[in-house]
Amino acid sequence: MDTQEEALNQAHTPAPAPTTGPAPTPVLAPALASAATAESRAAYFMREALKEAHAAALAGEVPIGAVVVYGEDIIARAHNRRETDADPAAHAEFLAIEEAAHKLGRWRLTGCQVFVTLEPCLMCAGLMLNARVDACSFGAWDPKAGALGSVYDLSCDPRLNHAFDVIPGILADECGDELTCFFRARRQRARE
């Protein structure tokens, strides 16, 4: 074989794949990428609400936390303070919505989404309706008093003058575990 023929054969032979270096980054289709982004966004904000729930537990309150998001920013955060404030309305969602309204300087919270670790009760779901929030994402279902799908569903009642989106089950296990651990510890202390 002459050198010209050898050169042509080598030019058409693929180079061996490199054996070292980082693996190629998978490219997601735009729809999958946006779904992954939406999922990580929701998880991020729910983790912030979980931080509030943990603060509530440390204060001896039922561990429920909430954040209000406007655009991509958390503008309000709160946790249950019923025992601390001796106030039956001091639910995490209620306090966070009040704070958001004060920060925005308006009672209509259009453009806002509430993230809360437990499905809201009737009072808090009613406040979300009155505040005109765009959406509520919650972690654990509340089969005893939930008002966004478990027992009641105020979010889409046709008799009401507003409706909002509900995204349930965000980090549901983590949110449920926070409550389970709190009440287990409370029962244990009561037995001692």
Name these PLM-found stretches.
Residues 84-94:
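A short, polar/charged loop-to-alpha-helix boundary motif
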Residues 106-118:
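Immediate flanking context of iron-sulfur cluster ligation sites
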Residues 82, 116, 140:
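Residues that line or immediately flank small-molecule/substrate-binding pockets and catalytic motifs
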Residues 60-64, 110:
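Short, basic and Ser/Thr-rich N-terminal targeting/leader segments
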Residues 49, 53-56, 66, 76, ...:
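Small-residue (primarily alanine) positions within well-ordered alpha-helices
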Residues 64-72:
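Short beta-strand scaffold segments in enzyme catalytic cores
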Residues 1-56, 123, 127-192:
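Zinc-dependent deaminase
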Residues 75-82:
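Short beta->alpha transition motifs characteristic of CBS
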